[in-house]
Amino acid sequence: RVQTIASRLEPQTRVFRADAPAWKWEVNVISSKDLNAFCMPGGKIMVYSGLIEQLALSDDEIAVVVGHEIAHALREHSREQASQAIAAQTAIDVGSKLLQLSDTLASVANVGYQALIATRFSRTDESEADRIGLELTARAGYDPRAGITLWQKMLSANQGARPPEFLSSHPAEASRVQQIQGVLPSVVPLYEAARRPG
């Protein structure tokens, strides 16, 4: 089921990257109770069975999840985050040596970077992946409004189990619902066009 949905989304990637439909896309479902999905560089996508089963996801909601992960691959977010982390660590190392800071203070600087700066970059990437993923979903003929029901289900499932948004690498579910509502006017017409016969 997940692979069938992904096979409809993959051709839509050409809108964002002309070379992407030719990538060796690979979608796997991992047997796990976790509510998660992730993407590795080059289009290797993993969806945990718990996400699908525990939240009783519809095909449209699965398309939103897979579209989101495809968007991460298209924008090379994991490579970008790795580059930012290396640059930050190098700056912290050089700065601590120049300022003759102790290892403890250098560690505090690193924790501060992770908590306050790296998470903001991650939230920006997540918001971009949500927006692009909804467009891919709509262009493939899946209802992008399922993004709202998906995140409402996630909010219900994760109630109270998250750090404050400013310390999280992902936007809070309620924030995501608001962002998705803002994107829907531009993607629902794409969905309606994809659903038209002819």
What label would you give each PLM region?
Residues 1-198:
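A Zn2+-metalloprotease active-site environment signal
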